[in-house]
């Protein structure tokens, strides 16, 4: 059997140094193995110094450890020997004392060359030692292990042309190649770690410079913004100094009132709704008239007479005019008060001239109808004592003697309007003038004596556009019951509304209430004109500015 076919197998025992320093760093172990392989102390010292400079927190150097333990520069490995029964023993067995303790003072030298010579003399190649050393050297990195395994395989594969020299070449070349590879790997790892540390240091420096540049740029931006703000604050004033606050500004209307109106052709609407709202007094009269008409039976409404008379409201307690604490026209509601229709004779005369002059004005031509009449009204009281008395009025024309009207007059309601600023007050009364039946002719009462007689000299001005008739009447009252046959003369001014127009507006109030309201308003407006004219005429007469003939 040749040497290459069956090389002898040997087992390497652990040295004392391996047992003590089995937990040291892998790089330190590699250093020891490299020192044992080539026996070069300077290379180990240089490698140790490089490792200490590149790696922090490393274990203590090997030399220090050896000096502390008292051993030489070379690690001692035990010599292997074989017993008769092929059992493996270590050199430590020989160095044990009698008591069984290990003697650490004995010198141990481990020489790879001597071991190889012994192996060569025995005829066995150092395959296991090389594999063990290679395994220890290849522990630091996986990449180096992979590369070294490839190189080992390439070196172990012999060429076919040199089969005869395999044993000799393998024995002489393997230790030298392993030594060179170990040196290259240790140096490469040391250089790689140094380069890596330098790259990390350079990267850290670059990061520091980048951070410094970023901070500097931020500071520059802030500084530039502050400079801009300082320039703005130095060159311009706050807005409160340039613009006056709204609360301190003078008020300027956005729309100039009445400046765009053509004053030469001024047309004003009655209101913004283009209507004239009724005042409270007018509204009160409208409601009162409506309620009074509504209380009358429908078959009797056609005989309604709504009239307005002027006089002075007198309290029942005395002959003087009432004086309530009011300053404008109002409704006087005291039941005991009454109004006797009568005005001063001089005012009556001036008012007659005033109204006639209005009717004769050119623009009013055809608007007024004037009727003059002289009649005598005789009032009869008829009825049984157990019945409500009836008052019949017979109107006879004085010139012809004919009976012009024979009616029964019933008083329904009245409304007193007090006018403190005027000379006269107003009474609005609503009466019924019912015709006497044919079976009760006027001739029947000619033989009877009337309770009162009144002679009327009347001028009537009918204004159809306002549905109003103005009666200016001079009345002579003949009291038949009094002992003295003296007559009493009164001057009456009376306004009467058109009854058919009033009833038509009343019936149509649900469809068009404006017609009814307008009719009553016009009636009151005509009364206001007469009332104010009487006040102005009385002031002129009694102050002496106007002489009455």
Swiss-Prot record:
Coiled coil: none annotated. Optimum pH is 6.5-8.5. Its main location: nucleus. One of its GO terms (cellular component) is mRNA capping enzyme complex. It holds the Pfam family mRNA_triPase. The active site is at residue 223. First step of mRNA capping. Converts the 5'-triphosphate end of a nascent mRNA chain into a diphosphate end. PANTHER family: POLYNUCLEOTIDE 5'-TRIPHOSPHATASE CTL1-RELATED, POLYNUCLEOTIDE 5'-TRIPHOSPHATASE-RELATED. This is mRNA-capping enzyme subunit beta. The gene is CET1.
């Amino acid at each position: 059997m040749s040497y290459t076919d069956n090389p002898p197998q040997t087992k390497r025992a652990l040295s004392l140094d391996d047992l003590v320093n089995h937990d040291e760093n892998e790089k330190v172990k590699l250093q020891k193995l490299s020192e044992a392989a080539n026996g070069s102390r300077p290379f180990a010292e240089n490698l140790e110094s490089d490792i200490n400079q590149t790696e922090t927190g490393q274990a203590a150097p090997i030399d220090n450890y050896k000096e502390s333990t008292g051993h030489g520069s070379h690690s001692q490995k035990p010599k292997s020997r074989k017993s008769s029964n092929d059992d493996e023993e270590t050199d430590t067995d020989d160095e044990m004392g009698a008591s069984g303790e290990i003697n650490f003072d004995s010198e141990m030298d481990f020489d790879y060359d001597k071991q190889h010579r012994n192996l060569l003399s025995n005829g066995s190649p150092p395959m296991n030692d090389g594999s063990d050393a290679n395994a220890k050297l290849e522990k630091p990195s996986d990449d180096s292990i992979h590369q070294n395994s490839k190189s080992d395989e390439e070196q172990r594969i012999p060429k076919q042309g040199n089969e005869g020299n395999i044993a000799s070449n393998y024995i002489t070349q393997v230790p030298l190649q392993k030594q060179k590879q170990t040196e290259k790997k240790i140096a490469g790892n040391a250089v790689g770690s140094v380069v890596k540390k330098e790259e990390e240091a350079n990267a850290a420096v670059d990061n520091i410079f980048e951070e410094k540049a970023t901070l500097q740029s931020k500071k520059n931006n802030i500084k530039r913004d502050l400079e801009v703000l300082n320039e703005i604050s130095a060159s311009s004033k706050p807005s409160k100094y340039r613009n006056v606050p709204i609360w301190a500004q003078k008020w300027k209307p956005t729309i100039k009132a009445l400046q765009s109106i053509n004053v030469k052709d001024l047309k004003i609407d009655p209101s913004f709704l283009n209507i004239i709202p009724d005042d409270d007094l007018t509204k009160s009269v409208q409601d009162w008239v409506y309620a009074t008409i509504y209380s009358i039976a429908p078959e009797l409404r056609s005989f309604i007479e709504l009239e307005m008379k002027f006089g002075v409201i007198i309290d029942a307690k005395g002959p003087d005019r009432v004086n309530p604490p009011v300053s404008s026209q109002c409704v006087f509601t005291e039941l005991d008060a009454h109004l006797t229709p009568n005005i001063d004779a001089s005012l009556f005369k001036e008012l007659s001239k005033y109204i006639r002059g209005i009717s004769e004005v050119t623009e009013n031509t055809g608007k007024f109808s004037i009727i003059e009449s002289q009649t005598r009204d005789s009032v009869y009281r008829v009825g049984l004592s157990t019945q409500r008395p009836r008052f019949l009025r017979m109107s006879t024309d004085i010139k012809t003697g004919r009976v012009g009207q024979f009616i029964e007059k019933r008083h329904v309601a009245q409304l007193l309007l007090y006018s403190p600023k005027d000379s006269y007050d107003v009474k609005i009364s609503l009466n019924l003038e019912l015709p006497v039946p044919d079976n009760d002719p006027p001739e029947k009462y000619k033989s009877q004596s009337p309770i009162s007689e009144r002679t009327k000299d009347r001028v009537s001005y009918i204004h159809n556009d306002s549905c109003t008739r103005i009666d200016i009447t001079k009345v002579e009252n003949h009291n038949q019951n009094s002992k003295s046959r003296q007559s009493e003369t009164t001057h009456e001014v009376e306004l009467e509304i058109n009854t058919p127009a009033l009833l038509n507006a009343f019936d149509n109030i649900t469809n068009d209430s404006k017609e009814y309201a307008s009719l009553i308003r016009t009636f009151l407006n005509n009364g206001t004109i007469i009332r104010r004219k009487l006040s102005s005429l009385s002031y002129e007469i009694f102050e002496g500015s106007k002489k009455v003939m």
